Amino acid sequence: MDVLTVENELRQVVSRLVTQVELATKQGKLDINLALEDALIPILKELFHLPKLHNLNAKQKNFPGIDLGDEFDRVAFQVTATTDLEKIKKTLNVFIEKNYQSNFDELYVLMLVKKQKSYSQLSIDKITGDVFTFNTNTHVIDPGDILAKASNLRVTAQKRILHEFKLI
């Protein structure tokens, strides 16, 4: 399988997943979001080089503010289908209230559907201040960003990511 074939297949699989999330969300069925937290772990491990990434909700049911974390490499993820600025602000408020910055240097908000074109960095900076750095251009990611990151990998890694997406 050549690179172009893998990338095309990845795009098809991810676009189906995004559509499923959008439709489930419109129906008020949020179970797909919870299932995706676990399903995305091997993909995020590969893309972000986080071998110890795990679901924090397994540690504590409904872990507040963040869903996935790698305490060794100090990276956390909030996985959500909500794409508005308020969701990001709420996540950051909880992150700082719970002092997660003492365990995690980076936080990504992973939108399961297409993110907005932009988010107010000024609004975010008012929350984070000097306590924590969060850049809306790099730390708010969506399936398009996942595909872009995957396209920079070797074809063997892309195949592994494609395999994981097909399992979802």
Residue ranges with predicted function:
Residues L10-R11, R16-A24, K59, L68-G69, ...:
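Generic ordered-secondary-structure signal
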Residues I32-I96:
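Catalytic centers of nucleases
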Residues M1-L10, T82-I168:
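Acidic metal-coordinating catalytic centers involved in nucleic-acid phosphodiester chemistry
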Residues M1-N55:
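Acidic-basic catalytic patches of nuclease active cores, encompassing PD-(D/E)XK
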